[in-house]
Amino acid sequence: MNALTAVQNNAVDSGQDYSGFTLIPSAQSPRLLELTFTEQTTNRFLEQVAEWPVQALEYKSFLRFRVGKILDDLCANQLQPLLLKTLLNRAEGALLINAVGIDDVAQADEMVKLATAVAHLIGRSNFDAMSGQYYARFVVKNVDNSDSYLRQPHRVMELHNDGTYVEEITDYVLMMKIDEQNMQGGNSLLLHLDDWEHLDLFFRHPLARRPMRFAAPPSKNVSKDVFHPVFDVDQQGRPVMRYIDQFVQPKDFEEGVWLSELSDTIETSKGTLSVPVPVGKFLLINNLFWLHGRDRFTPHPDLRRELMRQRGYFAYATHHYQTHQ
């Protein structure tokens, strides 16, 4: 924890009753909360959205907000304010979300509907160029020949922020487990900026605010490079970050050495959380002050994991980056 932003006392209210879901601190950290929709809420939600296939949500973007309202109404309109409060709270900003009864790949469409409803209670998910939709589904297998670490199973996918190589602001990231077979390892890795021991050192460095070039590989379907600094500040002057080691392109020796040292200290941070995410559950994090990655898998010839992601912006009038927008 650093001197810039200490954790404030804003833990889950003990004894707080919610309608349609429960909320508890996770076993890994009080910053990460576990939200579970009851079986009744899950069943009623799926019944009320059954008339709209996933394709309808893809074609008619307003339906994504409609299913969000249905879910919030089933939770006595307590869900939306709770989601926003948690994700915007610097001391927390992360949720592990589960719906009782949704836990099998045969329910993949239901998973997409649920995740879409939750995401569109806090904002709107951006267009994902990799998939051509507002969400992306992708598979990790035992052998991979892709052009990034996203699908490579036998190595750690280093901690990073999403949205570094696009111009849209990426306030939140949602990562859902759709299927898993013959899997050992591969936990999600999370690091809150304020738990990174070397934040002050790198945030105060002269290179922290220098715009750098970010370029994505062909699989991302993004051909335009973007330029922005690794660090910025929020409206209260606290550090936020837009960083990924694979796609930042240092222009010279000074930038390359600084980025390499930054990467080393992030990857060795003792503040990193290892979070198992079972099938049907998803992580929802504030992308400005949480970094995420993935631990390595144990090799198996029939290893398979399918994931779904959404990333987008909070539905607020103000930007959450203070300077470089």
Swiss-Prot record:
- Single Gene Ontology BP annotation: L-lysine catabolic process
Q: Return the cofactor note field.
A: Binds 1 Fe(2+) ion per subunit.
Cofactor annotation: Fe(2+)
Assigned keywords, A-Z: Dioxygenase, Iron, Metal-binding, Oxidoreductase
Work out whether the entry's keyword set contains Metal-binding.
yes
Picking any one GO molecular function of the record gives: glutarate dioxygenase activity
User: Which reaction(s) does its UniProt entry say it catalyses?
Assistant: glutarate + 2-oxoglutarate + O2 = (S)-2-hydroxyglutarate + succinate + CO2
UniProt: Fe cation binding residues: H160, D162, H292
Q: What is its EC number?
A: 1.14.11.64
Pathway(s) served? Amino-acid degradation
Q: How does it assemble?
A: Homotetramer.
Family to which this protein belongs: Belongs to the glutarate hydroxylase family.
Described purpose of this protein according to its UniProt entry: Acts as an alpha-ketoglutarate-dependent dioxygenase catalyzing hydroxylation of glutarate (GA) to L-2-hydroxyglutarate (L2HG). Functions in a L-lysine degradation pathway that proceeds via cadaverine, glutarate and L-2-hydroxyglutarate.
| The protein, known as | Glutarate 2-hydroxylase
Q: Which organism is it from?
A: Escherichia coli O81 (strain ED1a)
